[in-house]
Amino acid sequence: MVATARHIKEKDPEARVVFIGPCAAKKLEASRTYIRSYVDFVITFEELAGMFDALEIIPEELEESPIEFTATGAGRGYAVAGGVANAIEKCINEYYPGTEVKIQHAEGLAECKKMLTLAKAGKLNGYMIEGMGCPGGCVAGVGTIIPV
């Protein structure tokens, strides 16, 4: 979120950057002083659906407009549990073939806490850890509107 927002603001300082996603924690992240200047608003899918309902907007009835996708599949997978680590592993394998990559994953706060405790004690078999607070990853966050 922040890297994309920073890139947009560098290209157009007057742009309004709105992050829309299922993750309620992004609201807290965007309120941090060093991020606030890049991200103007954070809206969950649930909040967006509420806005559509209040304004009687039915997305399925709107005219489609062409979208230019420039993101990689690896980048779009960030929000799924294991997605960040998977993207990093793909990059390492591409730029440094033959390099061993040891990754540990955790989903849910209890599992993340357990993994961090093991890492702190030196009992984790991996040198990169990825923890997703929500089981299933960000796509299954509290602000989602469909089951994942």
What kind of region is each of these model predictions?
Residues 1-148:
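Iron-sulfur-associated redox domains of electron-transfer enzymes in respiratory
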